C-alpha cells in the first residue's frame, strides 16, 4: 500500500549550540565530535538545508495560523491513518524513519500549510461548478471479489433470488477472495470522489448504485470480478447543500499542486520577515524569496 506522506520533512529536530565551548555529540578513539563540527558538516548537505527550510516555514506558519490548528484536528487525522493501516501502522512509521510524535508533527505541518492555502485562495463560482461535476457523496459499499466472470454471474443470480444485505454477507464469506474484507461481509471503508485507492471502474459502479441495490453485471478490475452492494448512498442532492465540501475538495487539490504551494509558501515567508544569520545558508530560501535572506 503506497503512502502519500503529507509534507516533505524528515521529522528530525536539530538543536545546535554554537557557544565557544560546544557540547560533544559523540566520542571516538580518534577524538570527539562537537555540535559546532556537526553543524558545520550538516549545513553543507541537502538534507540539512531541507530541515532548516522546513523549520523556518513551520515557525512562520505557527505564528500566522497556529490558533486554527487544534490538537483535536491533528489527533483526528492521526487516528484516521492509524485505522487505515491497522496492525501494520507501526511498521509503516518505522519504514519511513518516523515516530508517532514526529508523524503528528508532520500532520500538524500539513494542516498549517493547508490553512495558508485557504487564506491565499479565492474560490470562484466557476470553480465550484466544475468541482460539482466531479463530486460524489461519501458512500459505503460491500463487495465480493472472484477470479472468474462466471462465478460473479452465479453470485448475482443468487442475489436476484434474495437481494438482502444479510444474504450478500453470507455470499461474501463463502465466495470472496478478498481476505481483508470477506469475514466482514465484504464491507469497505466509506469513500467519495476524492478517493485514490480504489479502481476508477469500481468507484463508478459503486456511485451509480442506489442504497440497498447491487450490480447486476460483474465489475471487472485488475484484481478480478466484483459484485458490489450499496449499504449507504445519500444521493448527490443539490450543489447548494455541499458548498463547504466542494470548497474543501478544491483546497485539497491545490495542496497537491506544486505551483500553488510554491506561491503560497513564498507569500508566507515574505510576510514572516525571515532573516538568515549564517552567511553560508543565506540562499536556502532564494527559490521562494527570489533573493538571499541576509543577516539583519
Curated annotation (Swiss-Prot):
Stated membrane topology is:
Lipid-anchor
Which positions are lipidated as N-palmitoyl cysteine? Answer: 21
| EC id | 5.2.1.8
Task: Spell out the GO cellular component terms annotated for this protein, sorted alphabetically and separated by semicolons.
Answer: plasma membrane
Q: Which GO terms describe its molecular function?
A: peptidyl-prolyl cis-trans isomerase activity
Compartments (UniProt record): Cell membrane
Pfam families, per database record: Rotamase
Keywords associated with the record = Cell membrane, Isomerase, Lipoprotein, Membrane, Palmitate, Rotamase, Signal
Q: Which family does it belong to?
A: Belongs to the PrsA family.
The UniProt entry, under HAMAP family, shows: Foldase_PrsA (MF_01145)
Tell me the protein's name: Foldase protein PrsA
Gene name for this UniProt entry: prsA
Amino acid at each position: 500500500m503506497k503512502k502519500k506522506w503529507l509534507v516533505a520533512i524528515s521529522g528530525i529536530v536539530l538543536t545546535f549550540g554554537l557557544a565557544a565551548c560546544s557540547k560533544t555529540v559523540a566520542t571516538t578513539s580518534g577524538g570527539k565530535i562537537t555540535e559546532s563540527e556537526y553543524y558545520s558538516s550538516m549545513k553543507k548537505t541537502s538534507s540539512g538545508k531541507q530541515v532548516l527550510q522546513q523549520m523556518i516555514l513551520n515557525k512562520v506558519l505557527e505564528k500566522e495560523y497556529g490558533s486554527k490548528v487544534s490538537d483535536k484536528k491533528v489527533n483526528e487525522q492521526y487516528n484516521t491513518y492509524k485505522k487505515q493501516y491497522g496492525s501494520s501502522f507501526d511498521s509503516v512509521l518505522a519504514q519511513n524513519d518516523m515516530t508517532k510524535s514526529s508523524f503528528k508533527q508532520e500532520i500538524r505541518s500539513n494542516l498549517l500549510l493547508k490553512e495558508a492555502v485557504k487564506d491565499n485562495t479565492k474560490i470562484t463560482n466557476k470553480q465550484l461548478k466544475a468541482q460539482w461535476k466531479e463530486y460524489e457523496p461519501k458512500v459505503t459499499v460491500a463487495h465480493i471479489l472472484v477470479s472468474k466472470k462466471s462465478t460473479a454471474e452465479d453470485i448475482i443470480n443468487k442475489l436476484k433470488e434474495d437481494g438482502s444485505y444479510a444474504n450478500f454477507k453470507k455470499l461474501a464469506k463463502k465466495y470472496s477472495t478478498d481476505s481483508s474484507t470477506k469475514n466482514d461481509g465484504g464491507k469497505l471503508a466509506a469513500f467519495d470522489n476524492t478517493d485514490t485507492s480504489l479502481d476508477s471502474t469500481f468507484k463508478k459502479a459503486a456511485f451509480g448504485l442506489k442504497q440497498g441495490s447491487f450490480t447486476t453485471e460483474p465489475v471487472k478490475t485488475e484484481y478480478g470480478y466484483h459484485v458490489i452492494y450499496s449499504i449507504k448512498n445519500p444521493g448527490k442532492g443539490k450543489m447548494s447543500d455541499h458548498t463547504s465540501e466542494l470548497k474543501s475538495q478544491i483546497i485539497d487539490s491545490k495542496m497537491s499542486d506544486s505551483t500553488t504551494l510554491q506561491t503560497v509558501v513564498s507569500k508566507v515567508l515574505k510576510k514572516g520577515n525571515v532573516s538568515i544569520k549564517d552567511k553560508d545558508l543565506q540562499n536556502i530560501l532564494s527559490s521562494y524569496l527570489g533573493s538571499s535572506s541576509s543577516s539583519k
